[in-house]
């Protein structure tokens, strides 16, 4: 929140960051908190898809080495010489014995799938959220609408494009 002063003798008045001069009531929620998690309402479909694709690629590329170590630790026939005490210890041992790039093997294929999948999921979620929020709760955000959107967009993402019935049978 920023304070602006008028001329001499005028009272200082609070002005919200978004330009609205309404009194915020002095609550604990500051004016910029909504902007942190939401894209602008004028954001296009391509903006939502780009944001989703970048988030998915980043998430998978960061967690892929940990997932590959976890999969190796859970495998039914692990290497008898492998004595892993923790995920970090296993990652260190794999890098030392098999090379630096071993935990990243297959990451390129994962990223090629994660980008389009997360782009579609994010775009579906944001579009349905905007539509259902208008139906359920005219002022602001509806938790019910967001939950419904989350569930339906997740089902839609993993279902084949031609036949929606297998994905919706799990509802």
From Swiss-Prot:
Span-the-membrane segments of this chain are 45-64, 105-125, 143-163
State the PANTHER family in the record.
MITOFERRIN-1 (PTHR45758:SF4), MITOFERRIN-1-RELATED (PTHR45758)
Reported function: Mitochondrial iron transporter that specifically mediates iron uptake in developing erythroid cells, thereby playing an essential role in heme biosynthesis.
Task: Map out region (Disordered) in residue numbers.
Answer: 1-40
> What reaction is this protein's catalytic activity?
Fe(2+)(in) = Fe(2+)(out)
Q: Which Pfam families match?
A: Mito_carr
Question: What are this entry's molecular-function GO terms?
Answer: ferrous iron transmembrane transporter activity
Q: Which GO terms describe its biological process?
A: iron import into the mitochondrion; positive regulation of hemoglobin biosynthetic process
Q: How does it assemble?
A: Interacts with ACB10; this interaction stabilizes SLC25A37 and enhances the function of SLC25A37 to import mitochondrial iron during erythroid differentiation.
Q: Where are the Solcar repeats?
A: 43-131
| Annotated protein name in UniProt | Mitoferrin-1
Gene3D superfamilies associated with the record: Mitochondrial carrier domain
Membrane topology according to the record: Multi-pass membrane protein
Per the annotation, which location comes first and is thus the protein's main one? mitochondrion
Disulfide links within the chain:
none
Where can this protein be found? Answer: Mitochondrion inner membrane
Per the record, the similarity remark reads: Belongs to the mitochondrial carrier (TC 2.A.29) family.
InterPro entries recorded: Mitochondrial_sb/sol_carrier (IPR018108), Mt_carrier_dom_sf (IPR023395)
| Gene Ontology CC | mitochondrial inner membrane; mitochondrial membrane; mitochondrion
Query: What gene does the UniProt entry assign to this protein?
Result: SLC25A37
> What are the entry keywords?
Ion transport, Iron, Iron transport, Membrane, Mitochondrion, Mitochondrion inner membrane, Transmembrane, Transmembrane helix, Transport
């Amino acid at each position: 929140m920023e304070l602006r002063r008028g001329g001499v003798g005028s009272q200082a008045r609070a002005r919200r960051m978004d330009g609205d001069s309404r009194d915020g009531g002095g609550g604990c929620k500051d004016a910029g908190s909504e902007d942190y998690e939401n894209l602008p309402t004028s954001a296009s479909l391509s903006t939502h898809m780009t944001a989703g694709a970048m988030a998915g690629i980043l998430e998978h590329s960061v967690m892929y080495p940990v997932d590959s170590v976890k999969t190796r630790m859970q495998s039914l026939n692990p290497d008898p010489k492998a004595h892993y005490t923790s995920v970090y210890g296993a990652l260190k041992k794999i890098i030392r014995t098999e090379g630096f790039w071993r935990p990243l093997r297959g990451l390129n294929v994962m990223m090629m799938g994660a980008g389009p999948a997360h782009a579609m999921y994010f775009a579906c979620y944001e579009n349905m959220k905007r539509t259902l929020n208008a139906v359920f709760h005219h002022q602001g955000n509806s938790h019910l609408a967001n939950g419904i959107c989350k569930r339906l967009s997740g089902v839609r993402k993993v279902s084949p494009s031609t036949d929606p019935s297998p994905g919706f049978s799990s509802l």
